[in-house]
Amino acid sequence: MKGNRIITIGRQIGSGGSEIGMEVAKRLGIQCYDRQLIEMACNYGELDQDILAEAEEKRPNPFLYSVPRQMQNDKTGRGIAINDMVFNLQSEVIRRLAEKESCVIIGRCADYVLREQPGVTSVFIYADMNVRIACLMERRRITRDEAITLIKKTDKSRRNYYECYTGKRWGAGASYDVTLNSAELGLDTCVDLICSLYERKQEGDAQAR
């Protein structure tokens, strides 16, 4: 991982966090990894993608406790919960990506997975509730009530997942290097700030050498 710079982005649904991450990667000329991490974890663990997608970014479920015998192999582990298996596989993929290249990684507790690695900047993107509701209503063509329900469900799922595997508070300032209110700052300013931080650290590395 020597010389690689990684930006991890945690986000509230409807905050524009994923869009910010993709634009940061585009501007910096690096890759952004989000949903494709599911496919990469499946390929690494030699598993069916639908099974991993169902358990991905969800707290361990007692009704999905053990990995079916036919799915078990040296990479998945044996006798563990499906959610734990998904977390372990994605964590290994994230570590391999960090070793290979500079990139942006969205969600998946990447800040925690790479906590002992140098060159990692962790960011959390949040926004006011009304802004998130409006965003989801427009993007997904759903009603206000449906947007509120989706926000509450997704927030709960991501919070439980993050706090279960990291022992830290999801969305709390102390859990990340930087927290940004995209509703107040705007998506473009959030992108500018993250890119500026990335470039400063890169310049610092060059001077240190």
Write out the residue ranges for each language-model feature.
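Short beta-strand-centered segment that lines the nucleotide-binding/catalytic pocket of NTP-utilizing
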Residues: 31-42
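RNA pseudouridine synthases
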Residues: 97, 103, 110-116
